[in-house]
UniProtKB/Swiss-Prot annotation:
Any GO BP annotation: glucose 6-phosphate metabolic process
Lineage: Eukaryota, Viridiplantae, Streptophyta, Embryophyta, Tracheophyta
Cited PROSITE patterns: P_GLUCOSE_ISOMERASE_1, P_GLUCOSE_ISOMERASE_2, P_GLUCOSE_ISOMERASE_3
Annotated PANTHER family: GLUCOSE-6-PHOSPHATE ISOMERASE
Predominant location: cytoplasm
Assembly and interaction partners: Homodimer.
The protein's enzyme class: isomerase
MF terms in GO: carbohydrate derivative binding; glucose-6-phosphate isomerase activity; isomerase activity; monosaccharide binding
The name this protein goes by in its record: Glucose-6-phosphate isomerase, cytosolic B
Presence of the UniProt keyword Isomerase in the record: yes
Organism: Oryza sativa subsp. japonica (Rice)
UniProt-annotated binding residues for D-glucose 6-phosphate: G156, S157, S212, K213, T214, F215, T216, T217, Q356, E360, H391, K516
Reaction catalysed by this enzyme: alpha-D-glucose 6-phosphate = beta-D-fructose 6-phosphate
HAMAP family the UniProt entry points to: G6P_isomerase
Length: 567
């Protein structure tokens, strides 16, 4: 039977609710005048520096949040995750993405069995295969070495690996290792995405990685069949075994598809899709592109934060602090969104990955016991690298809705540039904005300041910035594979902390099921109409009208022959 105990019923939660009034009367201009407060609101680990002094919080706020963490049994929940307890209760599964990057000699159990040796078994297999592939020993159907990889997956099988790939592309060591190679991703079932993923590629030199745990994911398998047709039409049916491999646990369907089961790489049901980038889902395609040693550095970076998260006191624990502040902003100050603003173009795919990781994890309306929540959980996550975002949506952030911001900066650029005679280097120009924007949000600009600057009266209200808009700054020493892994792990654990405090299950995603079920009905109707001329039926009047309009136009792909992208 579901328990009615919710975190919002605790004295600690109610104490924070009462505390909101005091914070509402305080402006960040005044809070930032307290140098001791600013110094206290920092944390550092392995050169990663967090400054959260521009949050609408005081020392008292933080103490109350730490007490809320105690009431939520946060430490106990973290230990349960690392110990392999089945904290994903709706699916009766452990949550062990931390095992994917654990050292070889570590013991992490699920159902009483240490999973680390099995994880390393898959990693060793990936290492061996990637070395064979990259050396040119693995050749395609025509005897040519393969230099192009297309990874076919969707959701977590796509967004996480894409983020890491984009971040590594301009790292000097990774770029050198990837010379002469291409890694692309195919996710959307839209045929345009198929066309883009294979544009200018030669099937003779291309390897396709099909990522689907069950080998039944509708979009992924349709895309896989499409790329199979692309290969077979050019090289013949026997080429599939040399040009397609899989990340899956369903070896029967892998073999039926035409892929040699020896070339299938496993992952486990205790790895959620959005947490799977450190499994074969990400490690395999990334190792094919960059080499396993570089990917291992990425995994080691993630593992370093796992250790920090598990062992550091909450007061200096970066993921815990971030999670607590997010709960404060969402559930007490009422801010529904979060902007993720990396001042590094290499992190251009970070916000989309965190968008899925956060919103799929914490977009829940009931407690882990199935009790309807009386408070909001989760945020609307979005973002864009600086300074591009400044010329896009910062207007709203400065003078519209209040949206807490995560500013992520890097001390040492992957690609330093300086033009003789310029005032600053290109990276210093970028970082000038990184350091300025949080203060602009916090302090704002008053009518009095504008009057002193002789701004015309009719423009005073337009040029006034209220300020008092919260942000935090996360400064990384550099952006090598190691730091990329650290950044990923920080956000993974931050999001888990939020879920642990709210008392929800951050590791299931039942919300994606209904739409898929309804799409199945539409798919059957489209088939019946296209192939048998049957009228649209079984839908509400609006959907029926839309479907009828769609079907009234002659399809661009006749159903009596195979049609492939024209690229």
């Amino acid at each position: 039977m579901a328990s009615s105990a919710l975190i919002c019923d605790t004295e600690q939660w109610k104490g924070l609710q009462a505390h909101v009034g005091a914070i509402q009367k305080t402006h960040l201009r005044d809070l930032m005048d307290d140098a001791e407060r600013c110094k206290a609101m920092t944390a550092e680990y392995e050169g990663i520096f967090l400054d959260y002094s521009r949050q609408r919080a005081t020392g008292e706020t933080m103490e109350k949040l730490f007490k809320l963490a105690e009431a939520a049994k946060l430490k106990e929940k973290i230990e349960k995750m690392f110990s392999g307890d089945k904290i994903n209760s709706t699916e009766n599964r452990s949550v062990l993405h931390v095992a994917l990057r654990a050292p070889r000699d570590e013991v992490i159990k699920s159902d009483g069995v240490n999973v680390v040796p099995e994880v390393w078994g898959v990693k060793d297999k990936i290492k061996q295969f990637s070395e064979t592939f990259r050396s040119g020993s693995w050749v395609g159907a025509t005897g040519k070495a393969l230099t192009n990889v297309v990874s076919v997956g969707i959701g977590g099988s796509f967004l996480g690996p894409l983020f890491v790939h984009a971040a590594l592309q301009t790292d000097p060591e990774a770029a050198e290792s990837a010379k002469g190679r291409q890694l692309r991703f195919l996710a959307n079932v839209d045929p345009v995405d198929v066309a883009r993923s294979i544009k200018d590629l030669d099937p003779e030199t291309t390897l396709v990685v099909v990522v689907s745990k069950t080998f039944t994911t509708a979009e992924t398998m349709l895309n896989a069949r499409t790329l199979k047709e692309w290969i077979v039409s050019s090289l013949g049916p026997d080429a599939v075994a040399k040009h397609m491999i899989a990340v899956s646990t369903n070896l029967e369907l892998v073999e039926k598809f035409g892929i040699d089961p020896k070339n299938a790489f496993a992952f486990w049901d205790w790895v959620g899709g959005r947490y799977s980038v450190c499994s074969a889902v990400g490690v395999l395609p990334l190792s094919l592109q960059y080499g396993f040693p570089i990917v291992q550095k990425f995994l080691e970076g993630a593992a370093s934060i796992d250790k920090h998260f598990r062992s550091s006191s909450f007061e200096k624990n970066i993921p815990v602090l971030l999670g607590l502040l997010s709960v404060w902003n969402v559930s007490f100050l009422g801010y529904p969104a979060r902007a993720i603003l990396p001042y590094s173009q290499a992190l251009e795919k970070f916000a989309p990955h965190i968008q899925q990781l956060s919103m799929e994890s914490n977009g829940k309306g009931v407690s882990i016991d199935g009790v309807q929540l009386s408070f909001e959980t989760g945020e609307i996550d979005f973002g864009e690298p600086g300074t591009n975002g400044q010329h896009s949506f910062y207007q709203l952030i400065h003078q519209g809705r209040v949206i807490p911001c995560d500013f992520i900066g890097v001390v040492k650029s992957q690609q330093p540039v300086y033009l003789k005679g310029e005032i600053v280097s290109n990276h210093d120009e970028l970082m000038s904005n990184f350091f300025a924007q949080p203060d602009a949000l916090a302090y704002g600009k008053t009518p009095e300041q504008l009057h002193s600057e002789k701004v015309p009266e009719h423009l005073i209200s337009h040029k006034t910035f209220q300020g008092n808009r919260p942000s935090l700054s996360l400064l990384l020493p550099s952006l090598s594979a190691y730091e990329i892994g650290q950044l990923l792990s920080i956000y993974e654990h931050r999001i888990a902390v939020q879920g642990f405090l709210w008392g929800i299950n951050s590791f299931d995603q039942w919300g994606v099921e209904l739409g898929k079920s309804l799409a199945s009905q539409v798919r059957k109707s489209l088939h019946a109409s296209r192939m048998e001329g049957k009228p649209v039926q079984g839908f509400n009047s609006s959907t029926a009208s839309l479907l009828t309009r769609y079907l009234a136009v002659e399809p661009s792909t006749p159903y009596n022959t195979t049609t492939m992208p024209k690229v």
